Amino acid sequence: MREDGKIDYVELPGGRDLPAVKHFYQSAFGWSFVDYGPTYAAFQDGGVDGGFQADPEAGLKAPLVVLFAQDLEAMEAKVKAAGGVISVPIFAFPGGRRFHFTDPAGNELAVFTEE
């Protein structure tokens, strides 16, 4: 069950060859994937849900921890009030919406809601 403020999934850089990344994790660890377009593949059997973002233009250079919120706008307001800086405004993607923020230490995280 998804809960506000809990880690929901981890997004990892997928590099320029997403099929090769998927093949590696399938072969080495037995993971299976669900593709969301040509540049994103989600996994659910790696111990925690997650996905690989293959679009080199997306700017993802490190793992991205994604938190969950029922009310995305309310959570965005809480993040701002607590001193977080919104680095990517709310946007839609297949399966939901999310925003990114940086914490006081400069770590980038995201908050997601289902649609």
Regions found by a protein language model. Give the residues of each.
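Tryptophan-centric aromatic hotspots in well-structured domains and transmembrane helices
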Residues: Y9, G14, F24, W31-F33, ...
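Conserved short beta-strand elements that form part of the metal-binding/catalytic scaffold
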Residues: W31-A62, E108-T113
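Residue-level hotspots at or immediately adjacent to binding/recognition sites across diverse folds
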Residues: Y9, G51, K78
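N-terminal beta-strand motif that seeds the catalytic metal site of vicinal oxygen chelate
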Residues: M1-K22, P63-V65, E115
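Vicinal oxygen chelate
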Residues: V66-E108
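Short secondary-structure junctions
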Residues: F29-D35, V85-I90
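Short beta-strand micro-motifs in enzyme catalytic cores
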Residues: D8, T39-A41, P63, R97-F99
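Conserved active-site alpha-helix within GNAT-family acetyltransferase domains
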Residues: P19-A28, F99, E108
